[in-house]
Amino acid sequence: MKAIYLILTVLCGFSASTKTGGWRDKDVDDEDIRKFATLAASENSKMSNSLYFEKLVKVIEAKSQVVSGVKYNITFEIAPTECKKNGKGYDKLSECPLLESAPHQTCTAIIWTRSWLNDTQILKLKCKEGGSSC
């Protein structure tokens, strides 16, 4: 009887730590995580009133959750570049250098992707001043 109790205790403890449908940590250097963080940074840049394009500096934290597809909760840092929104000179945002001494922002995005539908949606995107500054 004690052996059964011990086995049940271990199994219950294990199942609680691997909760189905729960958020799981992801590698911040994962290619998909960087792709989705870049997408969210680009969307924030479009919505901002800044004269300059903003781009991804680094991914701080990332989690995923299996739903009908996959939801990603990504925290990342963005900063303005030297590229003006109404200017020319760079073909790709990745080529734009960061604007020196400009404040960085820390952003959190919830992104939902359903690969079989080729569908990716930004469900939530919020940024605030306070990332590291170069």
UniProtKB/Swiss-Prot annotation:
N-terminal signal peptide: 1-17
GO cellular component, one term: vesicle
Extent of motif Secondary area of contact: 65-69
SS bond list: C83-C96, C107-C127
PROSITE patterns the record matches: CYSTATIN
Site annotation Reactive site: residues: G21
Top-rank taxon: Eukaryota
Pfam families: Cystatin
Subcellular location(s) per record: Secreted
Domain Cystatin: 21-116
Main location: secreted
Single GO term (MF): cysteine-type endopeptidase inhibitor activity
CDD domains in UniProt: CY (cd00042)
Stretches of the chain forming a coiled coil according to its record: none
Alphabetical list of InterPro entries matching this protein: Cystatin_dom, Cystatin_sf, Prot_inh_cystat_CS
Tissue: Expressed by the venom gland.
Keywords of the record: Disulfide bond, Protease inhibitor, Secreted, Signal, Thiol protease inhibitor
Function of the molecule: Inhibits various C1 cysteine proteases. This protein has no toxic activity and its function in the venom is unknown. It may play a role as a housekeeping or regulatory protein.
Similarity remark: Belongs to the cystatin family.
Protein name: Cystatin-1
